[in-house]
Amino acid sequence: MIAGGGTGGHLYPALAIGAEITNRRPNTTVHYVGSKFGLEARVLPERGLSHTLLPISGLQRSFSPRSIGRNLMLVSRVPLALLKVRSLCRSMEPNVIVGTGGYASALPIKVGIGWKIPTVIQEQNSYPGLTTRLFAEPATAVYAGTSDTSTYLDTDIDVTGNPVRSEIHNGSKTVGSELFRLDSERKTVFLFGGSQGSVPLNRAIQPVLPTLQDRGIQLLWQTGVNNYEALKELESDTIRIKPYIKEMAHAYALSDIAVVRAGALTLSELSVCGIPSILLPFPRATADHQTKNAETMVRAGAAIMIRQADLTASNLQETIIGLLDDTDKLTAMGAQALSLGKPKATKEIVDKIFKVALG
């Protein structure tokens, strides 16, 4: 049983682990547990994967009337969700429960620990999420994306890196050039703010476009689905605008630098691909964990961070141009990013899961 979701940062590690298990042991039953209100409610049925969706959503951490109302509704839904998880565990008798974080993983992890089912947690962020902080100590094992996670937990962890899709570091610059109709010989900036896009990033890059065009610098720009219609008219021969990019491996292969939010999974993919980055952490992420993720990359010399409060078109342009003009620095940052990458993380995690499951 693999439980996790709510956002792509928790769902896609679960899918990567599940795919690796299935590829290596096709007769193994992999069942996903998520939330009716998370991204997984769309993705799991689309992929035809065995799954159960729980009627729970995330805990709201503000004290607005709307948040209080949602939290009261959450409390009322927990008993039903708990019964559903218990029933699922009775019928499945899982050899191991894997939690990849997010509110969808909390109840399966709790039941697994309580019923003495081997239960492991995969934590993506430098600062561990609430579910990990609650259950790390009684869990069988914690597999962490970075060593920084140990600072915040009173238990031993295994630093494995984060599981990324196996194909992510096998992209082709030539294929990317053809796919996005851009010149593989030109410098290319890849800007994206996650699947939903980032309004501050989308806004800040617009005044920079003339300078990029004048210098022959290309921009591959994922706007987010909701922002695409308002921005698509800005496309030109050197600016390619997409609402959402599925072919991330080829996009990474084409890119010389990425301008992105600082979600753990994004940073793991950039590291595996050895791409220097300019990071804009989402300031309202829980416990400001994206800033902590970004700081890990900055300390290693793999990235430059601009806080959202400090973001302007001027300093974004200065940072992009400064890096692209400094080949030595760009190369060094790429090498440092690659040194952080753990392309075998998924394999290592699954090796450990098999050992736990087999006792």
Residue ranges with predicted function:
Residues K329-P343:
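A short, well-ordered alpha-helix in the C-terminal region of glycosyltransferases
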Residues H31, S50, I113-T174:
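Active-site-proximal region of nucleotide-activated glycan assembly enzymes
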Residues V43, R47, K173-V260, T291-E295, ...:
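Donor-nucleotide binding loops and adjacent catalytic segments primarily
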Residues P94-V96, R240, A253-S268, I275-P276:
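Acidic donor-binding loop of glycosyltransferase active sites
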Residues K342-G359:
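C-terminal alpha-helical cap of glycosyltransferases
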Residues T22, L83-I97, A104-V120, R133-E137:
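Glycosyltransferases and closely related glycan-assembly transferases
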Residues I2-T7, N27-L80, A309:
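Conserved nucleotide-sugar phosphate-binding/catalytic loop shared by glycosyltransferases and other
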Residues W115, A253-S255, S271-L280, A300:
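Conserved donor-binding/catalytic loop of nucleotide-activated donor transferases
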